[in-house]
Each structure stands twice: as structure tokens, then as C-alpha cells.
Amino acid sequence: MTGNEQKFSLQGKVAIVTGAGSGIGRETALCLANAGANVVVAEANETTGKETAAKVSAQTGSRGLFILTDVSRSESVQAMVIATIEAFGRLDIAVNNAALHPDASPIAELHEDHWQKIIGVNLVGVAFCLKWELQQMIQQGGGGSIINISSATINRPQEKMSAYIAAKHGITGLTQTAAVENGRHGIRVNALAPGGVATDLTMATMQELGLTEENEAARSSLFKRFAKPEEIAQSVLWLASDAASYVTGATIAVDSGLSLI
């Protein structure tokens, strides 16, 4: 193994990926596993979560473990972290990816229950995950990398996405605060802000908003296409690895230049 390969290796490490039942989460779980990490698939959908864990175990040299998790409930996240330690003994990497799609209504007509549900998963859920992940990393002596998944909409807001965008802005604040508080423990906390990604969630959102992939890709990408989920996963791998050892508190755009358009 060369020096560069060693920096990207996650051999012997343990990772949690929330919302890993599909899309970015699933590809991230597979990517981290291919780099050598054992991966906990923390997912609210038992069927898709078990599918991802099975793929990790079957397609990589690592172990995948599904744990049913509702990130909007602190006790569920705590139980998931405890189960991770019982299974693998430690926690080195956490990717807080679980999210609900936008509410598809303007602010003046927002559906209050759905708005609160989105905030509960997309923002409060990240806070709960950070709480229990950080406690475990500190308890085991420090070190580790946490990656929160934000969105390019923090720089390029769109109509009818108020709860989603508000939550993603909140992730920036959580990321920066967690980085400041935990640098002394050697824990790095960063966020990725993807642009358009070809996932089931993206397709469902566009359908609700009356948008098409062709038009949105042409409008929102210098490459005139959406990202593949695995392209986002590769950026997660970099932040998770020692190759990004001096990076913390950052929200990094992975958006094919959307923020420049």
C-alpha cells in the first residue's frame, strides 16, 4: 500500500451512516466499507436498511450491520450508538445523512405538522446524532471524523423548500459549533453540501415541485447533469480519512459549480 493509499484507508475503523437505506447513504456505506471500515447502517426503513447491510457484507471485505433507527428520537440514536459499541467496540466515523424531502409548499401556506417533522429529522436528528456520537468518541479517548450532509440549497435557495433549507442552514451552525467544541479532543466535524444528485429522494421532490431532471440539471450544474450518489460518497470518504486530517468546521460544496451560476 502506497503512502497515499494508506491515507485513504479505513482499515480497522468503524463507521455509522444514517439514512443508509438508499441514495447517498447507501453509496456512502459501500464506499466506506470498500475502504476497509465496518459499517453500521442506521436506517428507519427496515427493508432498505437490511438490503444495504447485506450489500456491504456481500460486496466488500467489511461487515455491514443494520440497526433500526429513528434519528428524530434521542433515545433511538443513543440505543443505536450503544449497539454499535457492543458489536464493534468503538466508533471512528459518523455520517449524518438521514433526511426527509421538502414540504413543497410556500411559507405562507406551510403545513405546520409536516414542517416540524422535516425539522425534527433533518436538523434535530443531526443534533441528536452529534450528541451521542461525540460522547462516545470522547469517552474512548478522542479522535474521529463526523460528516454531516447539508445541501447546496443553503447557497441557492428555491421556492417551496422552507423547512428543508432552514434545516440545512442549521446543519452549518451545528457543524461549526461541534468543530469548535471538540477540536481539543482531536475530533473533526465537517459538512458536505451536495447539489443535484440522482436519487429517489431527488426525483420525488422534483415530481412534487413539477420539475424535470433534464431542465434542473441544465440549470443547476456546470456539467449539465446531476451527480451520481457515489460521487458524493467519494467526498465523504476523503473527509472520513486521514487525507483530510487538517480539515474541520468546513461546509464543502460538492455541486458541480452551482454556487457559481
Swiss-Prot record:
- Knocked-out gene: effects: Significantly reduces the production of deacetyl astellolides A and B.
Fetch the InterPro entries from UniProt: NAD(P)-bd_dom_sf, SDR_fam
Q: Does the keyword Oxidoreductase apply?
A: yes
Q: What are the EC numbers?
A: 1.1.-.-
Induction section of the entry: Expression is regulated by the secondary metabolite regulator cclA.
- Which Pfam family is one of those matched by this entry? adh_short_C2
For the keyword Transmembrane, the answer is: no
Q: Name one GO biological process term.
A: terpenoid biosynthetic process
Which residues bind NADP(+) per the record? I24, D70, N97, K131, Y164, K168, V197, T199
Pathway(s) served = Secondary metabolite biosynthesis; terpenoid biosynthesis
In Swiss-Prot or TrEMBL terms, this protein is called Short chain dehydrogenase/reductase astE
**What top-tier enzyme class does this entry carry?**
oxidoreductase
**Which pairs are disulfide-linked?**
none
Q: Which domain of life is it from?
A: Eukaryota
Q: Name one GO molecular function term.
A: oxidoreductase activity
Q: Which positions are catalytic residues?
A: S150, Y164, K168
Species the sequence originates in: Aspergillus oryzae (strain ATCC 42149 / RIB 40) (Yellow koji mold)
